[in-house]
Structure formats: structure tokens, C-alpha cells
Amino acid sequence: MNLRPLHDRVIVKRLDQETKTASGIVIPEAAAEKPDQGEILAVGPGKRDDKGAQIALDVKVGDRVLFGKYAGQTVKVDGNELLVMREEDIMAVVQK
């Protein structure tokens, strides 16, 4: 991947959702919503405060995160659909 996020932005790859419900019903791809979970592939260096000091991000590469349905900007890189979003658009980190 040749994308390097700037400031407080992160690159996220959406994780595939289950296409079958707990009761065994298969959800067709056309009816499925976009997943709201993803894995962080790259992080920017962080914002700068009023004095110019860098504020590091709370997320790191490999974190599994939750984000809003309309969060981020979709980009295609090497045939993969990725999201570029600000750290503030991330709602939570999924603990393993």
C-alpha cells in the first residue's frame, strides 16, 4: 500500500460482515449494509497542539475499530476499497 495518512488521519480496511444470521438466514449481498468495523492499516503522526508539539493518536496499526456508517472518504488502492478518516470518526476499539 502506498498511502501515508497525514495529521490525525488513519487508513482503515472494512471487515466483512456475516452474511448469515444466527438463525441461519442468508443475507443477499445487495441487501447487506456496509460493515461498520475495520482494521487500521496505517496511522498519521497526529495533530499538533497550540505550542507545536505533536499529539500521538490513541489507535495503532492492527487495531479493530468501530466507526459510523458514513465515516471517512472511500479510496481504491491496488483494487482494494479503503477508508481514510480522522481519528475522531472512530467510536471505539474492539478489544480482543
From Swiss-Prot:
SMART domains: Cpn10. Keywords: Chaperone, Cytoplasm. One of its GO terms (molecular function) is metal ion binding. GO terms for cellular component: cytoplasm. The keyword Cytoplasm applies. Pfam families: Cpn10. It is found in: Cytoplasm. It comes from the Bacteria. Disulfide bonds: none annotated. GO terms for biological process: chaperone cofactor-dependent protein refolding. Its main location: cytoplasm. The keyword Chaperone applies. Together with the chaperonin GroEL, plays an essential role in assisting protein folding. The GroEL-GroES system forms a nano-cage that allows encapsulation of the non-native substrate proteins and provides a physical environment optimized to promote and accelerate protein folding. GroES binds to the apical surface of the GroEL ring, thereby capping the opening of the GroEL channel. Belongs to the GroES chaperonin family. Heptamer of 7 subunits arranged in a ring. Interacts with the chaperonin GroEL. This is Co-chaperonin GroES. It comes from Paraburkholderia phytofirmans (strain DSM 17436 / LMG 22146 / PsJN) (Burkholderia phytofirmans). The gene is groES.
